[in-house]
Amino acid sequence: MPVTAAGYSLAYSAPDRVAVVGAGMVGLATAWFLQERGVEVTIVDRAGVAAGSSWGNAGWLTPGITTPLPEPAVLKYGVRAVLSPSSPVYVPPSASPSFLRFVAGFTRHSTAAHWRRSMGKLVPINRLALETFDLLKDGGVRVHTVEASSFLAAYRTADERRTLLEEIEHIHAAGQDIEFDVLTGDEARAIEPLLSDEVGAAIRLRGQRFLNPGAYVPALADEVIARGGKLTTGPGSEVLDIADTGRGVRVVTAGGVEEFDAAVLATGAWLGKLARRFGVRSVVQAGRGYSFSVPVDRVPDGPVYLPAQRVACTPLGDRLRVAGMMEFRSPESRLDERRVKAIATAAKPFLRGADLEAREDEWVGSRPCTTDGLPLIGVTRSPRVYAAGGHGMWGITLGPATGRLLADQIVNGRVPAELEPFSPTR
């Protein structure tokens, strides 16, 4: 199967059997779209479905504001701010060489010029995001996305709001459409009574959606299984080794050895562990996000975003999920209660009728972040091994589109134009 990162042979032969390592949104979406193209799939995950950064995610489907994580605002925090446990962007002191490489690369890309270039590369895949969720719905996934009738970004002052308005201008300049309304605090409260009198200015984003990732991702897994896919999870499914045999791919798990025609590595913040041997040199760092749910007097009609505090609120059932924080730390680290309290403290002044002391479902998940803010999607140096990860905060939003495009590449042997900027070996 002569495919390389540099190009494709006319003799390309599509695989019949593919192993997908990772049962999060990206891995399961890739498996689903491979099945659509007639490929037999086996998914393995040592922890379980949605066990990485999927389950407690805010669940926003917001291609309109899906932007590169490295941005000039990160530099404004300064070293003192990012070392504070209460900062929304937290970097614990570390001497790890790989972590220092990540910080250096991330800082280098946190400029306006880099942001504009990366934003332009995200626009084509962003445009496919919502329509790809519709394909999954039409294909039988029983949990659906929700149209956000109100999606409000709330601020204390109009001056604070200027940052997002300027970002929207840059998003438009990159070629991405997003409709929005500029609101006063009173106008925002008329739309969403959850907002307190602290809110003096707001922006309503139009055309966005949300979902409950803890329900959606397992439903996607159920559909993959119903179509004949094999899913194994637990300690026996931990992948210990992957090797290109020259004829296929040998996948060694704690439970045994199996041969496939190709393999997809969709292991989130752990991507580098398996992908590095196949020429994926980009550092993938865990950017850990925290969330919890609280009772509210009235569940909002749509998400509420507090950009200055970097807090995301999503209605899920009869409770409100509150999420935030970007903590650059080992993905294996335990939940730090200080992060949870910092999010609650930041959100409390802006939310009316939300009991932020009655927290449940406290969670931490590791988002896979890259230094340039772009995902790693496509073939590696092995013609039979593919990578799919590094989406940062946007794995839920872009996961299905990633799976759709990567499945096309795996089956057809051609790199879709939307994926050209995201080569894992760049």
Where are these regions (language model features)?
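Extreme N-terminal leader/targeting segments of oxidoreductases
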Residues: 1-18, 36-37
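N-terminal Rossmann-like FAD-binding beta1-loop-alpha1 element of flavoenzymes
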Residues: 16-42
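Glycine-rich FAD pyrophosphate-binding loop
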Residues: 36-55
